[in-house]
Structure formats: structure tokens, C-alpha cells
Curated annotation (Swiss-Prot):
Function, as annotated: Negatively regulates transcription of bacterial ribonucleotide reductase nrd genes and operons by binding to NrdR-boxes.
HAMAP family: NrdR
Protein name per Swiss-Prot or TrEMBL: Transcriptional repressor NrdR
Source species: Actinobacillus succinogenes (strain ATCC 55618 / DSM 22257 / CCUG 43843 / 130Z)
MF terms (GO), sorted A to Z: ATP binding; DNA binding; zinc ion binding
Source superkingdom: Bacteria
Zinc fingers (unnamed) by residue: 3-34
Keywords for the protein's UniProt record, in alphabetical order: ATP-binding, DNA-binding, Metal-binding, Nucleotide-binding, Repressor, Transcription, Transcription regulation, Zinc, Zinc-finger
Cofactor note: Binds 1 zinc ion.
A Pfam family per the record: Zn_ribbon_NrdR
Family: Belongs to the NrdR family.
Domain ATP-cone, chain residue ranges per copy: 49-139
UniProt xrefs under PROSITE patterns: ATP_CONE
Family annotation (InterPro entries): ATP-cone_dom, NrdR-like_N, RNR_NrdR-like
Length: 152
């Protein structure tokens, strides 16, 4: 790493510590030339994969689209904006940690379903009705029964 004071390429690490719940490393460095000390922070850069639609079309991940879908499902339900943001962060983190460059849109939908199931059962059913393309009341009933069984 270059010294920010004298631009020498040689620096040595004096101290390393985990910060930000272990997602970042703080390093104290010393320049071997001018002996100035400075701090650096290292964070892994995780990329969000592209989304592959069912028709094969590929598009960049759209966080706003995800947010709108979840907000529509939780509309007029007792779910805080903070809980919605936590769910969005969790979904994004799971997508980043797949290690894949592309993921099917079904994976995103399934992750949303998992988060909504934890967040609010009515919001889960609302989202499921669109995502799973319910065509009649029997399909609604089956999904509600599955939800009831999973609560036991």
C-alpha cells in the first residue's frame, strides 16, 4: 500500500482489528520511509448478481423494485419501515453471498416469500397470491393451510 504522506510503496501493518460486526478490518500502518502512521479499512466487495427472468431476459438487480414489491405486500399492515429495510438488507446479503454472477428471478421471489413469512403472514399470502399466480380460492386455501401447519 502506498503511503499517503510520501507515496512510498513500502508500508507495514502494525495492528489489525475486526470492526463493523466482523465485516471490516481496520489496519494501523506505518510507512517504512517517513515513519508516518495511518489507518486503512478493508471491506469485501460483494456484487449483487444479475437477475435471469423466466423468459431468459437478464436485467440488473433493482433494489427499488424489491422494495416496492415488499411495501405493496405489507401495505396497511402493522409492519414498520425498519423491519421492511431489514428484510431488504437480508435478501440483498443472501444474493451477494451466492457467489453467482446471475441468479434466477425465482430465487429472489423465494427469498421475498421467506422474509414475508417471518414478517407478516397476511403480507406473505398477499405476495404469494401474485408470485404463485393463484387462480382460484382453492389455491389460496392450500397456501393458508401450509402456512398454518408451518406455525405448529
Amino acid at each position: 500500500m502506498h503511503c499517503p504522506f510520501c507515496s512510498t510503496e513500502e508500508t507495514k501493518v502494525i495492528d489489525s482489528r475486526l470492526v463493523s460486526e466482523g465485516y471490516q478490518v481496520r489496519r494501523r500502518r506505518e510507512c517504512t520511509n517517513c515513519h508516518e502512521r495511518f489507518t486503512t479499512f478493508e471491506t469485501a466487495e460483494l456484487v449483487i448478481p444479475k437477475i435471469v427472468k423466466t423468459d431468459g431476459y437478464r436485467e440488473p438487480f433493482n433494489e427499488d423494485k424489491l422494495r416496492r414489491s415488499i411495501q405493496q405486500a405489507v401495505g396497511k399492515r402493522p409492519v414498520s419501515e425498519d423491519d421492511v429495510e431489514k428484510s431488504i438488507s437480508c435478501i440483498i446479503h443472501k444474493l451477494q453471498t451466492t457467489g453467482e454472477r446471475e441468479v434466477p428471478s425465482k430465487l429472489v421471489g423465494d427469498l421475498v416469500m421467506d422474509e414475508l413469512k417471518k414478517l407478516d403472514k397476511v403480507a406473505y399470502i398477499r405476495f404469494a397470491s401474485v408470485y404463485l399466480s393463484f387462480e382460484n380460492i382453492n389455491e389460496f386455501t392450500k397456501e393458508i393451510e401450509k402456512l398454518k401447519k408451518s406455525q405448529k
